[in-house]
Amino acid sequence: MTKTIFESKTEGNWFLGSFQAFNYFTCFGNDESYEAIQDVFHRLLSTLKVEGLQLHVVQMTSDFQLLAFLVDMINQEYSRHIKVTQHKGAILVSEDDQLFLVHLPKEGTSLEKFFDLKNDNNFGDTILIATHNEGKTKEFRELFGKLGLKVENLNDYPDLPEVEETGMTFEENARLKAETISKLTGKMVISDDSGLKVDALGGLPGVWSARFSGPDATDARNNAKLLHELAMVFDKERRSAQFHTTLVVSAPNKESLVVEAEWPGYIGTEPKGENGFGYDPLFIVGEGSRTAAELSAQEKNNLSHRGQAVRKLMEVFPKWQLEN
């Protein structure tokens, strides 16, 4: 067995683990929390026939995050290919074609809803991202893949009409896209309206970030216009900015779910980095020196406005998903 110390720390969830001589776990919290974690821990390890996994739970708000952490440890230690998938409010643990564990929420889930498996494409929860942008979809796919969800985008639905972004706020635009497309497709849809807010420009480009340089805007033209607008702003503190994301999830006959997040930083004086898209080459992250375009995909997902918003979303998503 390896001596690796595994750790996962996200908002509301903090787990530590290692492999030793026997299965064991500890946790902070009340007796109810202890019993809930004990049940998940022992059922999973018994089903997968795993010995020697030791777990310490500092904080937990998500059963899915706990199962995903344990499965990731087991996969790394034993070179297995176990997957954790969300389906109709339940959490499924499987490997290849074998289902090992079904973890239901406390309030259960309806049989009719759970066993709606008319074909393989209906297995596993799917989210339709309301965008044609493959770069944005790639980020969401990496984030949601860790959460057991399959991701589609509008390129999979070429006959859908374009939804005009006529809102004056990020939430208005995100809600308009998600709710319209959900009604047209009957699917669960997530729309993110994201943009860059520059303090020296009164919050611009804001909801106009994608078309800041005009109707024929490109990333390069938008970046050039932003540098032009800030040409006489020399003090770094006055070049402060935030990437903002509003996520809206909509589904038929449901009240939409809304979360928001921001990523603070500064606008540089020249583009740097080859990764990312949009204003990433100009956005200096936090108090550091690297731009968002100089971060790896994993680093960006951990820090970014979109990554933060998705993590917030997944804290409230399971409960919302089960609501009538």
From Swiss-Prot:
Q: Which reaction does it catalyse?
A: XTP + H2O = XMP + diphosphate + H(+); dITP + H2O = dIMP + diphosphate + H(+); ITP + H2O = IMP + diphosphate + H(+)
CC per GO annotation? cytosol
Q: Which GO terms describe its molecular function?
A: dITP diphosphatase activity; ITP diphosphatase activity; metal ion binding; nucleotide binding; ribonucleoside triphosphate phosphatase activity; XTP diphosphatase activity
Q: What class of enzyme is it?
A: hydrolase
Q: Which cofactor does it need?
A: Mg(2+)
Q: Which residues participate in Mg(2+) binding?
A: 164, 193
Quote the cofactor binding remark: Binds 1 Mg(2+) ion per subunit.
In terms of InterPro entries, this protein maps to: dITP/XTP_pyrophosphatase, ITPase-like_fam, RdgB/HAM1
Which N-terminal stretch is annotated as signal sequence?
A: none
The UniProt record gives the binding positions of substrate as 131-136, 194, 277-280, 300, 305-306
| Keywords, comma-separated and alphabetical | Hydrolase, Magnesium, Metal-binding, Nucleotide metabolism, Nucleotide-binding
Catalytic residues at 193 (proton acceptor)
EC number, UniProt record: 3.6.1.66
Gene Ontology terms describing biological process: nucleotide metabolic process; purine nucleoside triphosphate catabolic process
The role this protein plays is: Pyrophosphatase that catalyzes the hydrolysis of nucleoside triphosphates to their monophosphate derivatives, with a high preference for the non-canonical purine nucleotides XTP (xanthosine triphosphate), dITP (deoxyinosine triphosphate) and ITP. Seems to function as a house-cleaning enzyme that removes non-canonical purine nucleotides from the nucleotide pool, thus preventing their incorporation into DNA/RNA and avoiding chromosomal lesions.
State the family named in the UniProt similarity comment for this chain. Answer: Belongs to the HAM1 NTPase family.
Subunit and interaction comment: Homodimer.
The name this protein carries in UniProt is dITP/XTP pyrophosphatase
Give the organism, scientific name. Answer: Streptococcus agalactiae serotype V (strain ATCC BAA-611 / 2603 V/R)
